[in-house]
């Protein structure tokens, strides 16, 4: 019997006790224990987890409970909305957490609240603000103390900060710094010993950056390892995340109908738990795979759904790439729409520039350089691409950076 199955009956038995603060205090503790047990077993956004957190919040709002219990409940509710890609709700709770913990004299509380805020800022496309917020969180980090708190917080919150900081650095083009943080995450994971933390930070600190960098072979290998680990350790939520990243990587490597079907199935399985975080990326990857097998209409429909998701969720971090892929669809359709493609690439470029998403900006600029005047000189392309390349630190192993550099030197051929 799982811990969650043990706690639930105890919550029900509380109602046989006499009314009063002692009963409410016990009930609050049991709801929190129930929610904490459900996180690795069921996921962050399932109805059972949310019900336990909401019940705990109602007791807290009646005046019962400690500061620690309040921050744990707020953190759980913020994470549930964040994983469900309800970014406005997650942001509101994260700001409540920051306001609350700024009045406390506890670095662990402050780290938890600033980490929550920084992760929401990242997925809403506020990369610079996210990095600043996550650096504030990191300043509160005590690796030994927070490692011991992994069981109370669900995962090691300090190590999670490093993962989110890594993402923000990648988007801002600080690739050498991001590589150093990635190595730090891997080093700390080796001796951690807390399965939910190992699963979570392997996905977010190793696999996610590989996906974003297009390192499909490494991602496939590490995702398969994560799925096996999560099955052994019963970390259900990240077994699903690993299955999703595995299917995504395989569709990148070989966009066959079979791999695309498996990818769609993995997305549906994730949605069944209430998790939608990262959907804009996965829809974009699915559209790219569909383009790879000539399913242009299906790719266009997938992108349409992705834009609707962005509008509904507030998840804007991959918006520039959705516009870029829209341009590619317009170029690939039976009657290529050059003007429509240019408009889409410009939207991608402008969106990425506003977000300071340097790699997205570079990809959009590369498409514009290819599309523009097919007789453009290397000098013309340098004027477009070099200012972006100049602010990207490192990345020589990345295909998008290599292709842009090749375009500026006239080495990469523009195919009509």
What annotation goes with each model-predicted range?
Residues 1-140, 163, 167-180, 208-221, ...:
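Inter-helical turn/loop elements of alpha-helical hairpins
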Residues 19, 27, 106-108, 142-158, ...:
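Intrinsically disordered, low-complexity acidic/Ser/Thr-rich segments used as protein-protein interaction/activation
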Residues 29, 72, 110-115, 119, ...:
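Residue register of alpha-helical TPR repeats
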Residues 194-267:
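Acidic, glycine-rich loop-and-beta core segments that form the ion-binding/anion-interacting portion
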Residues 230, 275-279, 283-285, 294:
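Core catalytic ATP-binding domain of two-component histidine kinases
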Residues 339:
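NTP/phosphate- and nucleic-acid-binding module
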Residues 409-416:
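Intrinsically disordered or compositionally simple regulatory linkers and C-terminal tails
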């Amino acid at each position: 019997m799982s811990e969650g199955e043990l706690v639930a009956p105890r919550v029900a038995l509380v109602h046989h006790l006499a009314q009063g603060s002692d009963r409410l205090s016990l009930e609050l503790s049991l709801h929190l224990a129930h929610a904490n047990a459900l996180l690795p077993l069921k996921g962050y956004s399932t109805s059972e987890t949310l019900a336990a957190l909401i019940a705990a919040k109602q007791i807290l709002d009646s005046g019962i409970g400690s500061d620690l219990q309040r921050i744990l409940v707020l953190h759980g509710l913020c994470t549930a909305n964040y994983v469900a890609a309800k970014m406005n709700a997650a942001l509101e709770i994260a700001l409540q957490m920051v306001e609350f913990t700024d009045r406390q004299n506890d670095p662990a509380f402050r780290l938890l609240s600033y980490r929550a805020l920084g992760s929401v800022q990242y997925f809403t496309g506020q990369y610079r603000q996210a990095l600043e917020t996550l650096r504030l969180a990191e300043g509160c980090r005590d690796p030994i103390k927070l490692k011991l708190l992994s069981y109370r917080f669900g995962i090691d919150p300090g190590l999670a900060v490093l993962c989110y900081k890594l993402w923000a650095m990648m988007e801002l083009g600080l690739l050498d710094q991001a590589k150093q943080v990635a190595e730090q995450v891997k080093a700390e994971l080796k001796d951690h010993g807390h399965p939910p933390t190992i699963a979570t930070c392997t996905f977010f600190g190793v696999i996610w950056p590989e996906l974003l960098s297009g390192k499909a072979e490494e991602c496939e290998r590490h995702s398969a390892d994560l799925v096996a680990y999560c099955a052994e350790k019963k970390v259900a939520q990240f077994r699903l995340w690993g299955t999703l990243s595995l299917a995504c990587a395989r569709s990148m490597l070989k966009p066959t109908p079979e791999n695309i079907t498996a990818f769609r199935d993995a997305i549906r399985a994730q949605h069944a738990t209430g998790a939608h975080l990262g959907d804009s990326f996965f829809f974009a990857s699915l559209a790219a795979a569909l383009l790879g097998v000539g399913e242009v209409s299906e790719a266009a429909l997938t992108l349409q759904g992705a834009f609707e998701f962005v509008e509904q969720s507030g998840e804007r971090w991959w918006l520039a790439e959705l516009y870029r892929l829209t341009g590619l669809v317009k170029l690939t359709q039976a009657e290529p729409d050059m003007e429509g493609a240019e408009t889409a690439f410009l939207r991608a470029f402008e969106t990425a520039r506003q977000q300071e998403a340097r790699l997205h900006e570079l990809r959009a600029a590369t498409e514009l350089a290819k599309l523009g005047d097919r007789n453009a000189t290397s000098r013309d392309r340098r004027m477009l691409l070099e200012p972006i390349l100049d602010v990207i630190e490192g990345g020589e192993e990345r295909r998008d950076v290599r292709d842009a550099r090749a375009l500026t030197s006239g080495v990469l051929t523009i195919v009509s």
